[in-house]
Amino acid sequence: MQRTPALQITSTGSFQGPDRFSYWADVVTQTFVPLQCDTPDRGSFCDDLRHRQIGLVGITDVQTSPLRAARTPATIARAPRDDLIVVLQIGGTCHTSQNASAARLLPGDGAIVTTDECNFFEFSGDFR
């Protein structure tokens, strides 16, 4: 019988104040790639992240407060990776860009970004 990979569940619910966002930024760096992240309100930031790694493929469900996340030259230099991230927008709105391409993602939309080039995501409200 083959064993199902463990589901990693992370939540900011047990953290208070700005520590919530710092904790979340660390989890995102460990789960995906290092990103430069910010949010309009660090004190009330909330997140639930569920991640399962199956071989080389990671599947992650993220529900979170508004935020901005960028893969910058500095974060790329710190941890060079040549991965693809497939974003499937389930709720909320996302503005994303990479190179000369930009898109506004609504529920049901998707995008593919590479981690070896700069990219930017902005979620202006709660999203999934």
Q: Which role fits each region the language model picked out?
A:
Residues 2-127:
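N-terminal functional module of multi-domain proteins
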